[in-house]
Amino acid sequence: MLTRIVLFAITNLAVLILASIVMSLLGVNPTQMSGLLVMALILGFGGSLISLLMSKAIAKHTTGAYVIEQPRNPSQRWLLDTVRRQAEIVGIGMPEVAIYEGPEINAFATGADRNNALVAVSTGLLQNMSQDEAEAVLGHEIAHVANGDMVTMALLQGVLNTFVIVLARVVGGFIDSLLSGNRGSGRGVAYYGIVLVLELLFGLFATIITMWFSRRREFRADEGGAYLAGRNKMIAALERLGINHGQSTLPTQVQAFGIYGGIGEGLRKLFLSHPPLSERIAALRMARE
């Protein structure tokens, strides 16, 4: 967590400097509300939308996943056939299907377009899950694609980013004015230091909101997996994950869209993208009754 906070601080400092340069070149005054909103919208949505558009390429690069063009064995043929069948049921285009090296049981889906997505599974999943369990996991990922979760998460992140940028600067300006005793003075080093601290603080709250929404999204994807593969298969798949549990080794760029997001206790649970497996299994069983 400390490493992430340090990296977040460095990134925000770089963004502050870059934003000031860009706004100066464009003739936009970021200290005025209109200029602040322009800057916040550009920075807030720019990063999340670029990440969304590049999500497939980023996922392939960070995981080393290779796309199955022509199946080399029955397992790969089964993967393609299952994904194709499930995609047809929910009415989306056939996603690219990929495999990445990893001992953990996991899979993920990503892509900016529900008709041009990517579904990838780990070698650990293929080695440790039955076909019934793997079918449910694939259904879970196809449900993410069909529900448009990648786009929704990007838009939510953009809104929260914009909120953090605006609020940090408004509150930062107020605090700086109180400390300096001069509400009309220009912004100095202290102001940017205050803004950086506030962005860290508000950014943590924004992350909690994003992860809460992500956990709600997982329940819906589980329901989608139950619809596509069968409720018992989806429950069995989650139980298998519980037996072979551990910390997720997926890169952070795609971790939110994996079938499994790791475990956590106490406050750390607020920052998890996935609910506890026990809660997901209980939700599926309650829906069946």
Swiss-Prot record:
Membrane topology type: Multi-pass membrane protein
Membrane-traversing stretches: 5-25, 33-53, 155-175, 193-213
A molecular-function term among this protein's GO annotations: metalloendopeptidase activity
GO biological process: proteolysis
Residues annotated as the enzyme's active site: 141
Binding site for Zn(2+): 140, 144, 218
EC number: 3.4.24.-
CDD domains: M48B_HtpX_like
Cofactor binding note: Binds 1 zinc ion per subunit.
InterPro entries xrefs: HtpX_protease, Pept_M48_protease_HtpX, Peptidase_M48
Family assignment from sequence similarity: Belongs to the peptidase M48B family.
Designated name of the protein: Protease HtpX
Gene: htpX
